[in-house]
Amino acid sequence: MRCGDATQPEEWWDGQPFGAIMLDAPCTGSGILRTRPEVKVRQSENNLVLLQGQQLALLRATWPLLAEGGELLYTTCSVLAGENQRVLAEFVAGESSASPAALAPPTQGDDGLACAASPEGLTFFPSAAHQGGFVALLRKTAAVPTVTPRRPRRRRSVKSSEAL
C-alpha cells in the first residue's frame, strides 16, 4: 500500500506497477445528502465542473501506474451521472487500454438497497438505511507508457569541516 498525492506519482512512485488501485475520487457528495445536508450548501455548477476535472486528472495520473491486466476500482459518494458515468466514459474514450468490467448489482434485500447498473458501473441510491454512491471497475488491457518514477536522492557526504 502506498500513500501519496495521486496527481503527482513521480514524487513517490518507485516504478513497480500496481495490480490493483482503488480511487475514491473527490465528489459533490450528492449521495450522502440525507445524513449530511450541509453538503448541498457547498455545491454549485462551477464546483461540479472543477470536480469533474479533478476526477479525470486523477484517473489519467493513476492509470499509467497500473500493471497490464490490473484493475482500477473507481468510487464516489455521488449519484450524479456527470461525476460518474460521464467522467468514466470520457476517460475510456481517450484511453485505449481501459476497458470497463461488468459489475453485478447486489441482490436487493429487505433493507431497501436500490441500485442501477450502467455500462460504466453501479449507482447506489440513498435510502433510509443507506448512503448513495457509485462504483466502477476498469481493467487495463495493454501496457502504456508509465510515469517516470522518482530517483533516489544521493546522499552527499559531509566533510567534517562542513558539519560544524
Describe the role of every protein-language-model region.
Residues 6-22, 26-28, 34, 49, ...:
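C-terminal catalytic and target-recognition region of SAM-dependent MTase-like enzymes
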Residues 4-7, 43:
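Canonical radical SAM enzyme core domain
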Residues 11-13, 33, 41-42, 63:
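Tryptophan-centered motif/residue detector
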